[in-house]
Every structure is written in C-alpha cells, then in structure tokens.
Amino acid sequence: MVFVSKVHGEIKYEEKNKVTFKKGILGFKNLKEYALVDLKEYEPFKLLQSLEDDAAGLIVVSPFEFFKEYEIKLNDEDTNRLDIKNQSDVVLLTTVTLDSDPKKITTNLKAPIIINISNNLGEQIILDKSDYKIKHLLIEE
C-alpha cells in the first residue's frame, strides 16, 4: 500500500503495519489509523504516520535501544483494552522530538505507545506513578 505524506513523501507500507488507536494519540485524538514504517536510513527510528492526515506523523523508537533498564507495568485494564494475550505480541515505542543538535534529541518515556501486533491495536498510555520524564535526553552525557 502507498500513502503520500506532506513531510516524508511517498510511504510504502503493508497492511500488517497498519495500527488502530481507538483513543487516538496525545495531540492527535481525532486520528485513529496509522502506519508504522521502518526508516531504514535512520534505524532504529520508525515513522508512525497518520493515514487520515498527510501532515501528521511521529518519529518513534523502542526505548530499549537507548535505555536497557526502562520498564513499565501494564495494568489489567490496559491489557484487556488492547486484548493482549502474550507478552511477545507487545511492541513498546516512545515518541521522539528531533533537534539539529543530536545531544538535544529527547524521547517521551512518561507516555509510551503500546501496540499489540497480533490485532494491530495501539494505545498511548500515561505512566502516572513513575519518575520517567516527558522530555528525556536520548543521548546522556
């Protein structure tokens, strides 16, 4: 499948990479359908592109690429809402805020994106009881 993004141009994706966010994503509550696309030239980063708004896309990354100790606990409500049966079906991503200075690139560890790859349902959750930050430096000195 092909989608044309205002920012990223022509994006090719497969149906299996389409993710539905029933509650939308923070800042994009009215947008529900996205494609998760590998950015091969910028690995390990990915693009979470809205399929409903050609100007709405987020750069995301697995937090484990940079923070091996990152840990969250999904509650039963989250697990039920996303119909998660196996932990191996869960993909965890965090949004990235880019900067021309790589030392200023941040990621949002406070509100990770959870995707159940067995049914392509996703949700961004807010970790109320954690010390994680909304703007956590990706590269710590």
UniProtKB/Swiss-Prot annotation:
UniProt key word Cytoplasm: yes
Keyword line: Bacterial flagellum biogenesis, Chaperone, Cytoplasm, Translation regulation
Subcellular location: Cytoplasm
Short name of any one Pfam family annotated for the protein: FliW
GO biological process: bacterial-type flagellum assembly; regulation of translation
The keyword Chaperone belongs to this UniProt entry's keyword annotation: yes
GO cellular component: cytoplasm
InterPro entries assigned: Flagellar_assembly_factor_FliW, Flagellar_assmbl_FliW_dom_sf
Chief location of this protein within or outside the cell: cytoplasm
Function comment: Acts as an anti-CsrA protein, binds CsrA and prevents it from repressing translation of its target genes, one of which is flagellin. Binds to flagellin and participates in the assembly of the flagellum.
Family: Belongs to the FliW family.
Subunit structure: Interacts with translational regulator CsrA and flagellin(s).
Name this protein carries in UniProt: Flagellar assembly factor FliW
Organism: Clostridium botulinum (strain Eklund 17B / Type B)
Organism lineage string: Bacteria, Bacillati, Bacillota, Clostridia, Eubacteriales
Encoding gene (name): fliW
